[in-house]
From Swiss-Prot:
Source organism superkingdom: Bacteria
Protein name (Swiss-Prot/TrEMBL): Photosystem I assembly protein Ycf4
NCBIfam families: PRK02542.1 (NF002712)
Gene: ycf4
The organism of origin for this protein: Prochlorococcus marinus (strain NATL2A)
Family: Belongs to the Ycf4 family.
Amino acid sequence: MSSESKLSQSEKELSGLVLEQKIKGSRKVSNYLVASMLSIGGVGFLLASFSSYFGRDFLPLGNPSTLIFVPQGLVMGLYGVAAFLLAIYFWRLINIDYGSGVNRFDKNKGVLSLSRRGLFKNIEIEIPIDEIKAVKLEVREGFNPLRRVSLRIKGRKDLPISRVGSPQPLLDLENEGAEIARFLEVNLEGI
């Protein structure tokens, strides 16, 4: 029992000196749906093209064997190949969980470590915590809305650290920014 209490106490001390945030990547329901629809649609177009070329129905619906191959069957085959290539790309992004990673603020080492999963390699960035001037909230509404948390860094451009994708609710964005600003003991800008 005493070892458990010591462990929890050391975890609390560690959590007071280290703030770690997990960032979600491309493993979202919407990406699974898009990849599935592209796969099914691509196979459907390819089967329609093959039906047109061979004169046999490979699809249970419709009668694609009656299509003339040169204009329609060929174009349907090209659509099928394009959809299939896009589906492969989406499945690859989902497989590697593109964009996922960790924001780790470590007061012991005095370093902010950002890591993200890239398409071909992982991206690692380390910045000294004392170079962070402020935490900035960016909110832009309209056709292409933007809601993100960025860090104002001395001598550099702002560094976005929030997840990419659908805009976060404003309350969640404010809470995330306030938590980081409180931990780093810097100002929160953009409210």
